[in-house]
Amino acid sequence: MKEVVLDTETTGLSVKDGHRIVEIGCIELNNLIPTKNVFHCYLNPKRKVSESALKVHGYTDEFLSDKKEFAEVADEFLAFI
């Protein structure tokens, strides 16, 4: 059975507060064994990273400022999953 393990990092915890995804990482498993198929990207959230999120992942506003926006990687991400 094929499965995808997905991990994200965000600017904060609440969508209600406008927080957004800054990193997506995925690996494909086949019968619980990792395949060589992976997807990874950093994203420009177009907003400030909260102090609490920065303490978790360490991605600064400066680091994320030149990354692609989600709309630019959405098709590739959806094709992977």
Locate each region found by the language model:
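Conserved non-catalytic scaffold segment of RNase H-like nuclease domains
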Residues: 1-81
